[in-house]
Amino acid sequence: MNPSKRVAIITGASSGLGREFARQLDAQQVADELWLVARNEKALTDVAGELDTPSRAVAADLTSEADIANIRATLSAEDPRVTFLVNAAGFGKFGDWQTISDAAVDSKIDLNCRGLVDMTRAALPYMERGSRIIQVASAAAFTPLPHMNVYAATKSFVLHYTRALRWELHGTGITATALCPTWVKTGFEKVARPSGGGHDVGHLLGEQTPQ
């Protein structure tokens, strides 16, 4: 490991919570370089341009085995010390089991679950005492949600995976935290909340004001 190079990796960094995490980690100066990961390279470049910390736009689809392999190869070649991993990549879509396509369901599971696990396993060998893993789950992790059944199940997976991982990391000084927000002011919230499914979710989770 090259201890002189501290890297923070943020997935989903092109928008929403991922972009905000990039801004906050930049402000806190927790790394020598930020790796901003998402599919939209132009959006990543725009985010990187807002930051003072040197930032790298890593255009990658986290459901692609080839793209995950490329990230692993870059980590192996550069051997940095990963101080933060923020897994904010993910998506949700309202609809019941009849209206959401099989492809959308599979993509949701692949990104929200497998992509998150793959990134965590890729980064862990480069972490040491003081490093942090932050997994973006959701308040949906705590209750079955009609019209978001698969999404809620994926976030429950993230919560339980992170809790178990935290126990496995006991004594290493590496921490793993699952973030479980309700509504957050993002592009997804603007579209989803006014929908019929959004009203059902609000009834179950509570109609909090988006933060």
Spans of features found by a protein language model:
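Conserved NAD(P)H cofactor-binding loop of Rossmann-fold oxidoreductase domains
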Residues: 88-93
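Conserved glycine-rich Rossmann-like NAD(P)H-binding loop of the short-chain dehydrogenase/reductase
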Residues: 26, 30-46
